[in-house]
């Protein structure tokens, strides 16, 4: 049950972030990006050419 809730939570956060990115012109999580100065959404940073969450 906890795994299901965690997956549901992560999907919800991703969808909200993607909707936010369309509005503000930033790169959604897990999408390709170029360099450290890329505009990844929220607390995400460009790492290995993909927007990932900060540790």
UniProtKB/Swiss-Prot annotation:
Record key words, sorted: Calcium channel impairing toxin, Disulfide bond, Ion channel impairing toxin, Knottin, Neurotoxin, Secreted, Signal, Toxin, Voltage-gated calcium channel impairing toxin
Q: Provide the free-text tissue specificity comment from this protein's UniProt record.
A: Expressed by the venom gland (posterior main gland) (at protein level).
Q: Which cysteines are disulphide-bonded?
A: 26-41, 33-46, 40-51
Q: Which cellular component, as a GO term, is one annotated location?
A: extracellular region
Q: Which GO terms describe its molecular function?
A: calcium channel regulator activity; toxin activity
The domain of life is Eukaryota
Chief location of this protein within or outside the cell: secreted
Its annotated compartments are: Secreted
The leader peptide range reads: 1-21
Q: Which residues form a coiled coil?
A: none
Protein task = Binds reversibly and blocks P/Q-type voltage-gated calcium channels (Cav).
The family classification in the record reads: Belongs to the venom Ptu1-like knottin family.
Q: Note what the entry says on domains.
A: The presence of a 'disulfide through disulfide knot' structurally defines this protein as a knottin.
Protein name from the UniProt record: U-reduvitoxin-Pr2a
What organism does the record attribute this protein to?
A: Platymeris rhadamanthus (Red spot assassin bug)
């Amino acid at each position: 049950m906890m795994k299901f809730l965690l997956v549901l939570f992560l999907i919800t956060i991703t969808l909200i972030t993607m909707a936010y990115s369309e509005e503000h012109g930033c790169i959604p999580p897990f999408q390709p990006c170029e360099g450290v100065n890329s505009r990844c959404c929220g607390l995400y940073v460009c790492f290995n050419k993909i927007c990932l969450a900060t540790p």
